[in-house]
Amino acid sequence: MKKVVILLVVFVWSSLLTETNACTGITLRTIENLPVTARTIEWAATPLNAMYVVVPRGYKQQSYLPNGERKGKKFIAQYGYVGIAVEQAEFVMEGINEVGLGAGLFYFPEYGKYAPYEEAKRSQSVSDMQLVAWILSNFATIEEMKEGMQEIQVIGTDPRASTVHWRITEKSGKQVVMEIINQQIVFYDNPLGVLTNSPEFTWHLTNLNNYVNLSAGSVNHRQVGNLSLNAFGGGSGLHGLPGDMTPPSRFIRAAFFQSTAPTLATT
């Protein structure tokens, strides 16, 4: 009966992914340069069954496998953490642990590719939807997490579901994006702290160059021949900022809006 329930949850999750529109993550900085991460999780047509989870040190978990059985890698929380899970408590979408390491997953269709599941690596296999929980349970820094990733195999639980990519932030303020492309794990430093969805993260950084003309505030008066030109109103420096909901456009908006946010002290 349990196997049937798990397979049903995986099916519902894969169905929801086909309707997913948007995940947008930003990172604000305090005056002390401490990171404050935030994000959205938006779904097109289906209410999201989300839940708040509090996981103590010593909590035992085991990864699900593609057949729906919970017989993958076992792990015990070395650090307690809190987070937001979807569909069931093991599937943590975003969270932070007691030593300040934060992690979240973002929809990444068409561009990611995990290695196929191998029964011989069953005890090393962690499902993509449980990777955030595994990271938060085990690591205090990004470097520790990178080393740990060499010891596991990330797997998908359903071939119909999209791949995802991840944002990991440590207390020092360092942040990386992790993607699995052509079965290889790659890490990118994330100086902006922004993440959306497809295509790959480096493409989004390159695309920012298309908007090098944008700036906060208003453009200055300009004389063209005998004609005097003035902006119609405030905010003209952001004329041309894309307004649609595609991942590239959301990345651009998040990057520029974030850059104009005030820097505040912690309290």
Named regions from a protein language model:
Residues 7-15:
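Bacterial N-terminal signal peptides
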Residues 1-4:
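Positively charged n-region of N-terminal signal peptides that target proteins for export
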Residues 121-153, 245-267:
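Alpha/propeptide regions of enzymes that mature by internal proteolysis
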Residues 21-36, 44-50, 157-162, 170-171, ...:
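C-terminus-biased signal that marks the final domain/tail of proteins
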Residues 94, 99-129, 142, 146-209:
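Acidic/His-rich structured neighborhood in mature extracellular/periplasmic domains
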Residues 7, 68-81, 138-151:
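Short, basic/low-complexity N-terminal boundary segments at the transition from targeting/disordered tails
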Residues 22-120, 160:
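A contiguous strand-loop segment
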